[in-house]
């Protein structure tokens, strides 16, 4: 008899689940026995490939296009998930954007878009998830934060601010939802080699050399933290941030 996975039979929804860390998390959850809704926004082929990979692992999956900044779109996303899977055990708020620009070159639209994707998106998705999870009297919400929410980075003002806000959101939401059996935590990765960060190759190499582990992280380096926070093993974790960052910061 095959050994049950840590997430056997659970139903997960991962925003931005078609690429990068989100895709790796969706696949890791499937490998541990979960069925997954892959929410995507820009590339249907990536989403379809992720779904196919999950199905190849013996789990069920659907891909749903969603704009996490839109209340109507988020409502439709969660309706699609519920119609297919009936319940929601795990939400991963991973959808995000990143842009490097100096303060004087940052438009109000740039600023508001960054905050909308990271903060409004997490708010809308968490609110929708909480409705389902309260009925079940249990659930897990995992927010994808960033070490830049702690230390900032020049020319990443909007992104660093959004991620700092998401850290505060994670802690406050954890205190609100814990009495309902819903555990909210976050993962704050360091620089991960996914192509998401606009740093040059030379800058990434220099950054890697500065780390105690002397290399950038990979999506696979991130997934154990996400599996842990979605599993029963994290039953006493509430409002906590895990830091897979190669030792760059040690909060």
PLM-predicted stretches and their roles:
Residues 131, 175-176, 235:
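Alpha-helical segment proximal to the catalytic Tyr-Lys
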Residues 1-3, 151, 227, 238-251:
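Short C-terminal tail/terminal secondary-structure segment
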Residues 18-19:
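Conserved glycine-rich cofactor-binding loop
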């Amino acid at each position: 008899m095959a050994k049950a996975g840590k997430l056997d039979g659970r139903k997960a929804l991962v925003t931005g689940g078609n690429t990068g860390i989100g895709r790796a998390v969706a696949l890791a959850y499937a490998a541990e026995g979960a069925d997954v809704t892959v929410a995507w926004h820009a590339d249907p082929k990536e989403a379809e490939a992720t779904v196919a990979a999950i199905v190849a692992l013996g789990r069920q999956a659907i891909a749903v296009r969603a704009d996490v900044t839109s209340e109507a779109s988020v409502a439709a996303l969660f309706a699609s998930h519920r119609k297919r899977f009936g319940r929601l055990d795990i939400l991963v708020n991973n959808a995000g954007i990143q842009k490097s620009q100096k303060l004087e070159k940052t438009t109000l639209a740039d600023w508001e878009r960054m905050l909308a994707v990271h903060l409004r998106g997490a708010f809308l998705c968490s609110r929708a998830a909480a409705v389902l999870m309260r009925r079940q009297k249990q659930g897990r919400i995992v927010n994808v934060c960033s070490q830049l929410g702690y230390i900032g980075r020049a020319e990443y003002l909007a992104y660093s601010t959004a991620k700092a806000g998401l850290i505060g959101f994670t802690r406050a939401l954890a205190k609100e939802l814990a009495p309902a059996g819903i555990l909210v935590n976050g993962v704050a990765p360091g620089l991960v080699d996914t192509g998401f960060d606009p740093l040059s190759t030379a800058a990434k190499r220099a950054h890697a050399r500065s780390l105690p582990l002397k290399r950038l992280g990979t999506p696979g380096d991130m997934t154990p933290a996400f599996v842990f926070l979605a599993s029963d093993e994290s039953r006493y974790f509430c409002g906590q941030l895990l830091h897979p960052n190669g030792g760059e910061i040690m909060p």
